[in-house]
Amino acid sequence: MNKKISLILILAILLTLIYYPYKPKIAENIKYGVTFSPTYTQTLGLDWKSIYINILDDLKVRNLRIPTYWSTIEPREGEFDYSSVDFMLDEANKRDAKVILVVGMKQPRWPECHIPTWAKILSPQERHNKTLKVVENTVNRYKDHAAVTYWQIENEPLFKFGDHCDKPNA
């Protein structure tokens, strides 16, 4: 029994001596950013445009993720209003900020699925088709915008949670 304990103790000491001096390489040039949601900013009772400008100018944020909530850009079926997205991308571009533009039904910030009121009465298949149309419209509108460096298609699309979300068909 003592031999077993001694062997385990020696092994533990050896492993400690081998791995203790190991220091993982510290990452360099980490790029931090923020997700900015005008909708959430407004729920806090704040002026989203001035807050956005302050984030860009005062905090010097140069990496952003911007949701394009379906309920905001198509409040009525077939009527698109991209004015808020235009503003954010143009202001980001003026400051050489990079933007990940989020498109689709499921996007950052609760309730996850930002479905316009008019689309909630549609069947899941009809809603799916309308979602594809708004994604197509948004991508075509911003595909050449200098501030858009990446696209995020849906946010956690295969997770089954989220208020008013259709079940994923994966």
Q: What do the PLM-derived regions correspond to, one by one?
A:
Residues 20-62, 67:
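Boundary/entry segment of secreted carbohydrate-active catalytic domains
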Residues 37-41, 69, 104-108, 153-158:
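Active-site beta-loop-alpha junctions enriched in small/polar residues
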Residues 49-119, 132, 167-170:
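Aromatic-lined substrate-binding rim segments of carbohydrate-active enzymes
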Residues 32-36, 64-66, 99-103, 149-153:
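Hydrophobic faces of well-ordered beta-strands that scaffold small-molecule active sites
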Residues 12-21:
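Hydrophobic alpha-helical membrane-insertion segments, chiefly the h-region
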Residues 1-13:
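N-terminal Sec-pathway targeting helices
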Residues 24, 94, 140-144:
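Secondary-structure boundary motif
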Residues 77-82, 111-170:
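Active-site cleft segment of glycoside hydrolase catalytic domains centered on the general acid/base Glu
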